[in-house]
Every structure is written in structure tokens, then in C-alpha cells.
Amino acid sequence: LTVAVLGLSVEKLKEVGYHPQFVTVHVPDHTGYYPSSQQMTLRLAFQPASGRLLSAQILGRRGVDKRIDVLSVALQGGMTVLDLENLELSYAPEYGSAKDPVNVLGMVAGNLLRGDLHTVTAAELEDHLDGWQIIDVQSPKVFAHGHVPGAINVPIDSLRNRLACIDKRQPVVVYSRVGYHGYLAYRTLVQLGYKVFNLDGGFKLFSEGGSRMGIASGEAS
């Protein structure tokens, strides 16, 4: 396992006077159809007004070094998250994806910067348990194996048919395993007039130490 760090953590940035935005993504280290693909986790902090890069951290088994090098050069060059979206990086199925993890990181951060996405951290979720609805859009089988305490299970494929169980008067937090289906649910509910947040890092980050709430299990009622 390899851990790479560029600049200060989000917590340290706040201590020295920054007010960063940040995103956490989990993406394959190379194309999923090629054997032995494994997920890597990337976090990027950036300035909320300009999108200029501030710091990054990566955790993974392969390809961590080249991604942190790309981000290091981008930071030194004064690039923004919007620049990361369009970086042209080398591709071969055994080494990367058509959309490199750095591109995906930039796209998610770009959505946040443009206001197309609003996220909430596990720590922030803990402070609003009484007032927010938590929606798990994973399958019932996955939900039964583990979920955020207090969440209700509304699988992404049946979301539009189960809107009656989601109160429009209260904020909604949606999540999936790594965030992709959570984002699809986010876009669907936003377009229908709900106030929605996507859980940063998905259930993967939540369950691997992003929260003090613990993990619930059991089938949806």
C-alpha cells in the first residue's frame, strides 16, 4: 500500500487560515476490464473562489506515484481544478483509464466549484442527524451488509418510483458505495426541487474511518 501527500491536509490548511473546499474520490487505478484493477482513493483541496489547487493525498497500491507527480506539477504551475478536468495524460488499459483518476478528481472538484454539486462530510452529518434524511441508494443486499445509521434504503433504480418516502421539506443526504450512484441520485433529486447533499467519499470513506457514528446493519424495513 502506498500513501502520497502533497502539501497540507485539510485540517492543517484550516489551522493556517485557509478555508478550502475539498473532494474525495475512489477510482480504479487502471481500466476496470483489464485484470487486477484496484481502487485508489484521492483527496484534493482547493480554493473555493478560484479553484486553485492547495493540496492532495492519494492512497493506493499501484500508480500512486505518477498521479501525485502530476498533481505536484499542476499545483506548482498554479492550475485550477478546471485545468485538471482537461489534462491530456497517457493511456493504456494496464496502466490507466481513458479518464485518468486525476481527470476524475478534477471533474468532481469542478462540479463542486461550479455549484453543480454540494457535499457533506461524515463529521458534518453527525451534527445534523435529527434534521436530515439519509438515503442509501445501494441495493438491498449491500444495504443489509452495512449502512449509515438512520439511513433508509431507496435503490437508485427505484428512486423515481419512491419519491413519496422522501420529504421535500427536509434536507436530504444521499450516498452510494464510492459516490457515483450517489451523484446520480443527487442530480435526480435536485432537478425535482429537493435540497440535497452527496456524502463526500461515499460509504467507503464513512465505513473506513470517516465517522464516529459506527455502521448499522440489517435489511431495510
Enumerate the language-model features and the residues they cover.
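Rhodanese-like catalytic fold shared by cysteine-dependent sulfurtransferases
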Residues: L82-A123, H128-Q133, P140-V173, R177-S221
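A short, polar/charged loop-to-alpha-helix boundary motif
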Residues: R62-V81
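Active-site proximal loops enriched in glycine and acidic residues that flank catalytic Cys/His/Asp
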Residues: T24, F46-P48, Q57-G60, Q138-S139, ...
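Generic non-transmembrane alpha-helix signal with a bias for helix starts/N-cap capping motifs
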Residues: L6-G7, R67, G182
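Mid-to-C-terminal Rossmann-like scaffold of FAD/NAD(P)H-dependent oxidoreductases
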Residues: L1-R61, S97, P101-D127, W132
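Generic secondary-structure signature for well-ordered alpha-helical cores
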Residues: L1, Y18, Q76-T80, L89
